[in-house]
C-alpha cells in the first residue's frame, strides 16, 4: 500500500503537463506544493519557459526563489493564468476546505484571480461533506477573537479552538489568528460562510466554494481526474 507522500507524488506529472510557455502561476501552500516546486523549477529550466509565480505564503515564496523560480507580488500582476494548490478536504461537488497551513486568505485571493484553478490531493482528502475529517479554519482579527469564537459556537453544535503552534498562538502572514471549527454533519457551507464573513473581525473563511476547475487525486489505483 502506498503512503500519503507516494500518492501525492503520483499526481505531479498531471499538474506539470498544464504548465507551458509564458504563464503567470499562482503557487499554493502546503506539503503537496513543496513536493511540486523542485519539479516545477526543473521543468521551467529545461524548457526555457518564461514563468512568473505569485505565491500564497512567505514560506512558499522563499522556497520558490531558492529554486530559481521568478516570483512577483500579487499587486504587480493583472491576471493569473493557472493556480495550483492542495486542499484539506474535497466534497463530491468539488467544494473544498483549505487553510491547514494558515494561508487561506492569500490562497483565496490568488485562486479566485486565476483563469483556471487546479487542486492536487491524495485520496484521504476526498470526503462526503465538508468538515467530515478536517476542521474549518477561519482567519480572524486578534483584537476580538474570543468574542468571534463565542458567536461561531452559538451558530450550531460547533467546537471552536484558537490554533496554537508549540503552545503559542499561531499568527498568519497577515498578522491574524486562526480559529479551527469542528463542524457537525448537516452544516450548509454556503449559509455558514455567509454568517461567518459578516461577523466583525472575520478576515476570511477556509471554504473555497464553486472555485475548483479540476481536482487531481492520487489513489491506490492510480491518478483520478475530477471535473465539474
UniProtKB/Swiss-Prot annotation:
<dbReference type="GO" id="GO:0006014">
    <property type="term" value="P:D-ribose metabolic process"/>
</dbReference>
<dbReference type="InterPro" id="IPR037171">
    <property type="entry name" value="NagB/RpiA_transferase-like"/>
</dbReference>
<comment type="pathway">
    <text>Carbohydrate degradation; pentose phosphate pathway; D-ribose 5-phosphate from D-ribulose 5-phosphate (non-oxidative stage): step 1/1.</text>
</comment>
<dbReference type="GO" id="GO:0005829">
    <property type="term" value="C:cytosol"/>
</dbReference>
<dbReference type="InterPro" id="IPR020672">
    <property type="entry name" value="Ribose5P_isomerase_typA_subgr"/>
</dbReference>
<protein>
    <recommendedName>
        <fullName>Ribose-5-phosphate isomerase A</fullName>
        <ecNumber>5.3.1.6</ecNumber>
    </recommendedName>
</protein>
<feature type="binding site">
    <location>
        <begin position="98"/>
        <end position="101"/>
    </location>
    <ligand>
        <name>substrate</name>
    </ligand>
</feature>
<keyword id="KW-0413">Isomerase</keyword>
<feature type="active site" description="Proton acceptor">
    <location>
        <position position="107"/>
    </location>
</feature>
<dbReference type="Pfam" id="PF06026">
    <property type="entry name" value="Rib_5-P_isom_A"/>
</dbReference>
<dbReference type="InterPro" id="IPR004788">
    <property type="entry name" value="Ribose5P_isomerase_type_A"/>
</dbReference>
<feature type="binding site">
    <location>
        <position position="125"/>
    </location>
    <ligand>
        <name>substrate</name>
    </ligand>
</feature>
<comment type="similarity">
    <text>Belongs to the ribose 5-phosphate isomerase family.</text>
</comment>
<dbReference type="GO" id="GO:0004751">
    <property type="term" value="F:ribose-5-phosphate isomerase activity"/>
</dbReference>
<comment type="function">
    <text>Catalyzes the reversible conversion of ribose-5-phosphate to ribulose 5-phosphate.</text>
</comment>
<feature type="binding site">
    <location>
        <begin position="85"/>
        <end position="88"/>
    </location>
    <ligand>
        <name>substrate</name>
    </ligand>
</feature>
<comment type="subunit">
    <text>Homodimer.</text>
</comment>
<feature type="binding site">
    <location>
        <begin position="29"/>
        <end position="32"/>
    </location>
    <ligand>
        <name>substrate</name>
    </ligand>
</feature>
<dbReference type="GO" id="GO:0009052">
    <property type="term" value="P:pentose-phosphate shunt, non-oxidative branch"/>
</dbReference>
Amino acid at each position: 500500500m502506498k503512503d500519503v507522500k507516494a500518492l501525492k507524488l503520483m499526481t505531479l506529472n498531471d499538474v506539470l503537463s498544464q504548465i507551458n510557455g509564458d504563464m503567470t502561476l499562482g503557487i499554493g501552500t502546503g506539503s503537496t506544493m513543496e513536493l511540486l516546486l523542485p519539479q516545477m523549477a526543473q521543468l521551467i529550466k529545461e524548457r526555457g519557459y518564461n514563468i512568473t509565480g505569485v505565491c500564497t505564503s512567505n514560506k512558499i515564496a522563499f522556497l520558490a526563489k531558492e529554486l530559481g523560480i521568478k516570483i512577483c507580488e500579487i499587486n504587480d500582476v493583472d491576471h493569473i493564468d493557472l493556480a495550483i494548490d492542495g486542499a484539506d478536504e474535497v466534497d463530491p461537488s468539488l467544494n473544498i476546505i483549505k487553510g491547514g497551513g494558515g494561508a487561506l486568505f492569500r490562497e483565496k485571493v490568488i485562486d479566485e484571480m486565476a483563469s483556471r484553478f487546479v487542486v492536487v490531493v491524495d485520496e484521504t482528502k476526498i470526503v462526503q461533506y465538508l468538515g467530515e475529517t478536517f476542521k474549518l479554519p477561519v482567519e480572524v482579527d486578534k483584537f476580538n477573537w474570543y468574542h468571534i469564537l463565542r458567536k461561531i459556537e452559538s451558530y450550531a453544535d460547533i467546537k471552536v479552538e484558537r490554533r496554537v503552534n508549540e503552545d503559542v498562538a499561531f499568527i498568519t502572514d497577515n498578522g491574524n489568528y486562526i480559529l479551527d471549527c469542528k463542524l457537525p454533519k448537516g452544516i450548509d457551507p454556503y449559509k455558514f460562510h455567509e454568517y461567518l464573513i459578516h461577523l466583525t473581525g472575520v478576515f476570511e473563511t477556509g471554504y473555497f466554494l464553486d472555485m475548483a476547475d479540476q481536482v487531481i487525486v492520487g489513489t491506490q489505483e492510480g491518478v483520478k481526474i475530477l471535473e465539474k
